[in-house]
Amino acid sequence: MGRGSGTFERLLDKATSQLLLETDWESILQICDLIRQGDTQAKYAVNSIKKKVNDKNPHVALYALEVMESVVKNCGQTVHDEVANKQTMEELKELLKRQVEVNVRNKILYLIQAWAHAFRNEPKYKVVQDTYQIMKVEGHVFPEFKESDAMFAAERAPDWVDAEECHRCRVQFGVVTRKHHCRACGQIFCGKCSSKYSTIPKFGIEKEVRVCEPCYEQLNKKAEGKAASTTELPPEYLTSPLSQQSQLPPKRDETALQEEEELQLALALSQSEAEEKERMRQKSTYTAHPKSEPAPLASSAPPAGSLYSSPVNSSAPLAEDIDPELARYLNRNYWEKKQEEARKSPTPSAPVPLTEPAAQPGEGHTAPNSMVEAPLPETDSQPITSCSGPFSEQYQNGESEESHEQFLKALQNAVSTFVNRMKSNHMRGRSITNDSAVLSLFQSINSTHPQLLELLNRLDERRLYYEGLQDKLAQIRDARGALSALREEHREKLRRAAEEAERQRQIQLAQKLEIMRQKKQEYLEVQRQLAIQRLQEQEKERQMRLEQQKQTVQMRAQMPAFPLPYAQLQAMPTAGGVLYQPSGPTSFPGTFSPAGSVEGSPMHGVYMSQPAPATGPYPSMPGTTADPSMVSAYMYPAGAPGAQAAPQAQAGPTTNPAYSSYQPTPTPGYQNVASQAPQSLPAISQPPQTSNIGYMGSQPMSMGYQPYNMQNLMTTLPGQDASLPAQQPYITGQQPMYQQMAPSTGPPQQQPPVAQPPPTQGPPAQGNETQLISFD
C-alpha cells in the first residue's frame, strides 16, 4: 500500500459512485497521476479497481471499468503487468458470464478487444490475445473496433539505475556520500549533483521531486519557453498570409459612420440616465445615514470604463457594426471623456498599493484626498474601500459588476464568432485574408485585450487582498488559539496552586493535630503522674496513721493504768522458757472489740469512755512484778465472782452457748465454779461451738506440745503466795475482757468474803480450777 492510499480510495469511491450521471474524468485523471508518480502502488490500485468491477450495482461496475481503461492507457508497464495476466482475464470472463447488464457486457468485450490489439506485439502479454481468440470462438460478439482506441502512448518514469559512483561527478558512494536517484532520467547521483527539485508533467508528477541539474535545466527551459509563447500571437496567425498584410482597418462609408454616431448617442443617453438614477439612490441612502457623507466624494473617481482606458482603444469603434454588444465599450465619446478625466486625476492602470493612500494627500488631488481624509465608519466595508483604491469603490453598487459581466459575455461571443468563422473558412478552403469579417473580429478582440488584462490584474489584486485578509484571519485565529491555550495554562496553574495550597493546609492541619495529640498525651501523662503522686501521698499518710496508731498502742501498753496481758505475755516468758504468741488482736484495757469491728465504730469506742475502776481491793504486791518467773495477771477480786458474772452474761453476745447457759451462783468460791464449769463450758481441748465472737474462740491454736492438764499446770505455775488472793479463773473466749468491762457506774457490789480452800484439798478441786484458768 502506497503513501496516498487514503487519497486513492477517496478518489476511487468518487469516480465509481452510483450517484454519477456521467463519467468523472477529473477524479480518474487524479487516480492516474497518483499511480504514475508512485504515491499508490499499481498492484494495490488494480486490486481496488477489481473490487469495484465485481460490485453488484451495474453503475458502479461500469464506472470501475472506465477507471481501469484509463489506468491501463495512462499508467504504463506497471499497470499492464497487473492487468494483462491470466488471473485478471479469467475474472473478466467470469464477470461476463454472470453479468446481465448490456452496457457492462459490451464494456468488458470492448476492453478485451482493445487490449488484445494493443498488446499483440508483446510476448509476455500473449494471454490477452489468447483470451480474445477463445471468446471469439465461443461466439461472443465484439463491438466495432477503432484503432485509435488502442493507442497506449503514455510515458512513465524510468526505472532507477543502481551503481557505486555518481553518474555525473564519479564520486564513490559511502557512509557520508549517499545515493540519490533522479526521477526524470532514473540515473544515480550524489547529493550535490541532485539538489534540485522540480515537477515532471510528462510523467504525471505534479509535485516537486528530486531531479539532477541537467534535467532541472531542461524542464525549466521548457517552462520558460511556454510562458514566453503565451504572450505572443498564435502560430496559425503567424504562418498565415494575414500577418503579412497591413493591419490598418478598412475605410467605411458615411452611412456606417452616421449609424455609429447615433448608436453612441443612444448609449450615452442611457448611460447618463442610469448614472442619474444611481446618484439619486445614493443621495437618499446618504441622507438616511449621515455618517457615510464622505462616500459621495469618492464617487467622483473615474468609473469602471476609465480604468480600462488605453491608447489602443482608438480602433474600438471600427468593430461596432460587427458586434453590437461591444458598442457600449467601444463608444468613442464616452471613452474620450473618461480619458480626459483620467488625465485630470492620474490614476494608474495597475492597482493602487496599500501604502499609497498615505502619500496621496500631499498631491493636492480632490478625489484621492477625500478618500484618505474621510473618517472611518464603524462598519467593516469602508476600510476595504479606502485600501483597495478606486477599483473597489466601483463595487459599492452593482453597476460595475454587471458591466464586467456584460463585457466578458460580449468578449466571449466575439471569440466564439471568430473561432467559428475561422473553422468555416478552413472547412471551405477559403483563405482568411480575403474574409473581412475575420479581420474585423480580430481587430475588435485585439482592442479588448488590454481591458481584459486590466480586469484580470484587478481581479488578481483583489484575490491577493482577500488572501491577505484570510491570512490575517488565520493569524487572528492562531492568536486566539494561543491565547486560549495560555488562559487554559493559567487556569491550570491556578488550579495546581490551589491544590498545592490545600495540600499544604491539610499538612499543617495534620501537623497541628499531631501536636495537639502529643500535648493531650502529655497532659494525660501529667494527670496520671499527679494521680499516682496523690495515691502515694495518701498511702504515706495511711502508713503514718498506722505508725501513729502503733505508737499509740505501744504507749498505752507501757502505761501502768492500762495493763495489757498480751503485751506482758510477749515480754515475759514463762518459767518453762516457752513464749506464747497471742492469737488475737491487741485489746486495749477497758475496751470491747468484737469480731468484725472497725476502729472508730460505736462498738469499738463505747467502752473507751467508761472509766476503769481506779483501785482494786487488792493492790499488786511489789514483789510480784520483780519475779521474772511469775506470770503477772489481772488481779480479780475473789470475793465477788457472782456479782461480775451476771453483767458479763448480759453484755456479751448471746450467740455463744457457753455464755448463754452460764448462770453463776451468788455463792462465791472456786469449788462451786469448778463444779458448774463442766456443765456450762466446753473442755479446753475441744474446739468451741460458738460463733466468731473472740479471737480465742474463732482461731484455736494448734499447739505442737501436749495440752495442759492439772499435773502439767501445777508443775508449770510458780509457787503462789498465801497472802495473795486467788485469781479468778479464765473462761474460754473473751471472758476476762467482759470481766474488765463490768460496769462501774452502778452501786458497788458488796463482795462476800472469799473462803480460803483448805490446803489439803484433793486433786479434783485443782482439776476444776485448771479448766477455769487461761493464759493470754
Swiss-Prot record:
Q: Where is Zn(2+) 1 bound in this sequence?
A: 166, 169, 190, 193
Modifications the protein undergoes after translation, according to the UniProt entry:
Phosphorylated on Tyr-334. This phosphorylation occurs in response to EGF. A minor site of phosphorylation on Tyr-329 is detected. Protein phosphorylation may also be triggered in response to IL-2, GM-CSF and HGF.
Domain (UIM): residue spans on this chain: 258-277
Annotated segments matching region Interaction with SNAP25 and TRAK2: 444-542
**Bilayer topology annotation:** Peripheral membrane protein
The answer, when asked if Protein transport is one of the entry's keywords, is yes
Low complexity: bias regions = 294-311
What residues bear N6-succinyllysine in this entry?
550
**Designated name of the protein:** Hepatocyte growth factor-regulated tyrosine kinase substrate
Q: Where is the composition biased (Polar residues)?
A: 379-398, 725-743, 767-776
Q: Name one Pfam family in it.
A: FYVE
Region named Interaction with NF2: 479-776
The record lists the lineage as: Eukaryota, Metazoa, Chordata, Craniata, Vertebrata
Protein encoded by which gene: Hgs
Q: Where is this region: Disordered?
A: 223-319, 338-401, 719-776
How is expression of this protein distributed across tissues? Ubiquitously expressed.
Q: Where is the composition biased (Pro residues)?
A: 745-762
* Entry's Gene Ontology cellular component terms: cytoplasm; early endosome; early endosome membrane; endosome; ESCRT-0 complex; multivesicular body membrane; secretory granule
Q: What does this protein do?
A: Involved in intracellular signal transduction mediated by cytokines and growth factors. When associated with STAM, it suppresses DNA signaling upon stimulation by IL-2 and GM-CSF. Could be a direct effector of PI3-kinase in vesicular pathway via early endosomes and may regulate trafficking to early and late endosomes by recruiting clathrin. May concentrate ubiquitinated receptors within clathrin-coated regions. Involved in down-regulation of receptor tyrosine kinase via multivesicular body (MVBs) when complexed with STAM (ESCRT-0 complex).
Comment field on protein domains: Has a double-sided UIM that can bind 2 ubiquitin molecules, one on each side of the helix.
Q: Which organism is it from?
A: Rattus norvegicus
Q: Where are the annotated FYVE-type zinc-finger regions?
A: 160-220
Q: Which residues carry this modification: N6-acetyllysine?
A: 207
Phosphotyrosine-modified residues are: 216, 308, 329, 334
